[in-house]
Regions:
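Structural signature of hydrophobic alpha-helical transmembrane segments
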Residues: 37-50, 88-106, 150-164, 214-227
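Helix-helix packing/entry segments at the starts of transmembrane helices
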Residues: 100-104, 175-191, 229-254
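Specific transmembrane alpha-helical segments of multi-pass solute transporters/efflux pumps
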Residues: 25, 62-97, 102, 138-139, ...
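Loop-to-transmembrane-helix transition segments
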Residues: 11-19, 62-85, 129, 152-161, ...
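Hydrophobic transmembrane alpha-helices of multi-pass small-molecule transport proteins
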Residues: 55, 124-143
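C-terminal transmembrane-helix exit sites in multi-pass transporters
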Residues: 59-60, 105-130, 254
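Hydrophobic alpha-helical transmembrane segments of multi-pass integral membrane proteins
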Residues: 11-15, 40-57, 128-131, 156, ...
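Glycine-/small-residue-enriched transmembrane alpha-helix faces in small-molecule transporters
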Residues: 1-42, 85, 130, 134-137, ...
């Protein structure tokens, strides 16, 4: 079920399309910043740290609502895992393979919408799931021989990111009655905390190098990315809160 008027429905779809565009092209600036020495996990951490600072400065009451609402903590984890896994995966692996596995999201959306929202997947949702699975099969099946069943770290990150994204969108729908600024802050906090924790953990293992000394190139690039992601994530939480989970899933893979 869609919330609001037909105009609201169209605006929600447009907002989701903007967010989908962001997911489709964001790998490029992340790779450019990685070439300047900033690991994607640190990029994600810094981008969302800036977003959190802006949102808290503008709407400080959102902090109280997030802290007092345990269900929004799930959104924190889901949004954080989505951004950390996707941004890391597309910078270390084949972009097409990672994105295709990420966009198995309709499969997870159908399952999570049934479990958390009571939304049953109809024939159209089933066809979307089949389309997502067939697309992944085409990419993973080589020109000759058996499919590549042994997935590497980038592919696992794509899968994990897609599942987290589905949970993120379902939780946005489930928590549609919460304040929009609180939902946005939960998503931004997730990007900051989850990516930051992973960066510190993998840094201790020698996998993720620390950020380089400040330089105009990567600092300005990170700032620009932060404002882009603020708009994109606000668009996602607006659209996903107003459309059913299955509609959100199909718009996001358009």
């Amino acid at each position: 079920m869609t919330l609001g008027t037909p105009a609201t429905h169209r605006l929600a779809i447009a907002a989701l399309l903007f967010n989908a565009f962001t997911w489709g092209v964001s790998w490029w600036p992340f790779r450019q910043l990685q070439a300047l020495g900033v690991h994607p996990l640190w990029q994600t951490t810094l981008v969302f740290a800036a977003a959190v600072a802006v949102l808290v400065a503008a709407w400080p009451r959102a902090v109280v609502e997030v802290v007092r609402t345990p269900s929004l903590w799930v959104l924190v984890l889901a949004a954080g895992a989505t951004n950390a896994c996707f941004n890391w995966g597309v910078t270390i692996g084949d972009v097409v393979r990672v994105v295709l596995l990420f966009y198995l999201m309709p499969l997870w959306s159908a399952l999570l919408a049934w479990l958390l929202l009571g939304e049953r997947a109809g024939l159209a949702a089933g066809m979307r799931i089949a389309l997502a699975l067939s697309g992944a099969a085409v990419v993973l099946w080589p020109a000759q021989g058996a499919p590549e069943l042994a997935l590497g770290l980038p592919e696992w990150l794509g899968l994990a990111g897609g599942f987290s994204f589905a949970l993120n969108n379902v939780m946005l729908r489930r928590e549609a009655g919460r304040g929009e600024h609180a939902r946005a802050l939960a998503m931004f906090l997730g990007g900051l905390l989850v990516a930051g924790a992973l960066a510190l953990w993998q840094g201790r293992n020698g996998v993720v190098p620390p950020p380089p000394d400040p330089a105009w190139g990567w600092v300005l690039g990170t700032a620009a990315l932060a404002f882009w992601f603020i708009g994109s994530n606000l668009a996602l939480q607006y659209g996903a809160a107003r459309l059913d989970a299955h509609t959100t899933a199909v718009v996001m893979i358009s």
